[in-house]
């Protein structure tokens, strides 16, 4: 039986939200009374998908919708390339989602990687006889952190293993007719979007300072590319705080696109720049631990009248697996109400460890009960028994021990402890309850000049940390990637 609230984030299913060939084009278009159309894009490159998800058919699309649209008698008609879907669109509650979550489901689509490319899906929203129900995408679509009218959709294969999530938003309104008709005004925005995983146990959201820095970086690059293409600029790309959202940052400019050759050169230059923009949007590296399991997308948004630049690129971090931890246990993030912060920091060491020693501190946080992923390995009130790091045996002598700081309690020092030689495992026993763990920290004392990044294995300059609730059969050991 499905447990209500067991999967708090869309698509409210246990599937891979970042791996798949199908996504919505960044912009939807209106088409007559209460009808809205979305274009499907197919991308089978390594940044979009791996393995079977790259070739799977598109069986079903589910949209994240507002439960207020689930009104008796209200309905949605769906077509693909002008033909009604084989099975009618249905509005339904999400059984595993939080209270109030709902989806619009289009199933048995029968599309593949060839027939889905540029296929157009149109939705006609109808009220009941009493005029109740949703008639606009502002009312229908639920996309927290995005501008109103943005729709979030998941594309499923038949087995519902692959479910890449993407967004489509409103096009910018046409500009007022103040520019002479001999010119071609191009109102273009660059949208940098982070798409959280379905199980978002370490949520990362853009703050105002990060947004301003990313907007400035993108603006500088776009203005330089416009100059290099010898294109006349009406309004340079520039930061705008009103275009900063939790999971999306938009940077806009306006230029003359009447010279088709110059516009073609600009298009090629911006296409080559998209990977750099993804790096900017992800803090320098898409494998930044803060964005573990996230997808980063950079795309253009144009005005309705003229699609001057139509570009998009997505990336996720796919690192090779590591032989850690050295046991058989449940490594799924979120199966315990404890997490390790994606960043560590350095501080002066406890005097016990002597001179020329630095401590590298990892903060522990806790989840709400509704965020914990159901499993057989965790029982209510299980303690945070220990933390293990994937660390090189070659640096055993450099690790002096631990200083641990339970929340609300006194700190204490603990001697270093390692697994058997060859397992490359550094560990510390804690036995913390939820109160002690929420904001508690564990600091590893390391002899200079070595650093935490030196002793950790797996990802260059980063660490894999695994947390445990016990050491006997059927236990939890979720793995979290961390960095400086």
From Swiss-Prot:
> What is the organism field in this record?
Volvox carteri (Green alga)
Record keywords, A-Z? Extracellular matrix, Glycoprotein, Secreted
Q: Which Pfam families match?
A: DUF3707
Q: Would you say which domain of life the source belongs to?
A: Eukaryota
Name of the featured protein: Perphorin-2
What residues bear carbohydrate chains? 16, 240, 256, 265, 326, 330, 356, 411
- InterPro entries xref list: Pherophorin
What Gene Ontology cellular-component terms does the record carry? Answer: extracellular region
The listed locations are: Secreted, Extracellular space, Extracellular matrix
Query: Top-down, what is the taxonomic lineage of the species of origin?
Result: Eukaryota, Viridiplantae, Chlorophyta, core chlorophytes, Chlorophyceae
Q: What induces it?
A: By sexual inducer glycoprotein.
- The question of whether Glycoprotein is a record keyword is answered with yes
Q: Function, please? A: May be involved in conversion of asexual males and females to the sexual pathway.
- Asked whether the UniProt record includes Glycoprotein among its keywords, one would answer yes
């Amino acid at each position: 039986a499905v447990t209500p609230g067991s999967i708090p984030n869309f698509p409210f299913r246990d599937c891979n939200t970042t791996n798949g060939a199908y996504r919505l084009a960044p912009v939807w278009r209106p088409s007559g009374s209460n009808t809205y159309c979305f274009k499907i894009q197919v991308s089978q490159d390594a940044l979009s998908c791996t393995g079977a998800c790259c070739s799977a058919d598109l069986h079903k699309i589910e949209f994240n919708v507002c439960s207020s649209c689930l009104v008796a008698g209200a309905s949605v008609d769906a077509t693909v390339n002008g033909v009604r879907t084989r099975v009618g669109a249905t509005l339904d509650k999400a059984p595993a989602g939080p209270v109030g979550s709902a989806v619009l489901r289009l199933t048995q689509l029968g599309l593949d990687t060839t027939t889905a490319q540029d296929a157009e899906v149109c939705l006609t929203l109808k009220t009941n006889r009493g005029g109740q129900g949703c008639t606009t995408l502002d009312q229908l679509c639920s996309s927290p952190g995005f501008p109103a009218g943005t729709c979030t959709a998941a594309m499923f294969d038949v087995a519902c293993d692959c479910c890449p999530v993407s967004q489509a938003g409103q096009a910018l309104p046409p500009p007022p007719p103040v520019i002479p008709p001999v010119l071609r005004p191009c109102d273009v925005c660059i949208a940098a979007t982070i798409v959280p995983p379905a199980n978002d146990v370490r949520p990362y959201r853009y703050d105002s300072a990060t947004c301003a820095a990313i907007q400035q970086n993108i603006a500088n690059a776009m203005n330089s590319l416009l100059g290099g293409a010898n294109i006349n600029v009406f309004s340079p790309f520039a930061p705008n705080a009103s275009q900063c959202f939790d999971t999306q940052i938009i940077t806009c400019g306006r230029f003359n696109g009447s010279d088709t050759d110059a516009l073609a050169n600009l298009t090629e230059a911006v296409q080559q720049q998209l990977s750099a923009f993804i790096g900017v949007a992800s803090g320098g590296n898409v494998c930044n631990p803060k964005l573990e399991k996230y997808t980063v997308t950079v795309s253009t948004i144009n005005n309705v009248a003229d699609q001057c630049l139509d570009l998009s690129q997505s990336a996720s971090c796919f690192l090779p697996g590591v032989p850690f931890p050295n046991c058989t246990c449940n490594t799924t993030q979120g199966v315990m109400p404890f997490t390790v912060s994606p960043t560590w920091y350095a501080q002066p060491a406890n005097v016990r460890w002597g001179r020329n020693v630095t401590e590298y501190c990892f903060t522990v946080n806790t989840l709400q009960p509704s965020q914990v992923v159901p499993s057989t390995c965790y029982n209510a009130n299980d303690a945070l028994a220990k933390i293990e790091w994937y660390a090189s045996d070659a640096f055993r002598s450099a690790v002096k021990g631990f200083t641990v700081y339970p929340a609300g309690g006194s700190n204490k020092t603990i001697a270093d402890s390692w697994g058997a030689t060859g397992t490359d495992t550094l560990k510390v026993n804690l036995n913390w309850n939820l109160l002690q763990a929420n904001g508690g920290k564990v600091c590893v004392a390391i002899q200079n000049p070595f650093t935490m990044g030196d002793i950790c294995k797996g990802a260059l300059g980063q660490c894999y940390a695994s947390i445990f609730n016990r050491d006997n059969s059927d236990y939890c050991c979720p793995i979290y990637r961390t960095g400086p």
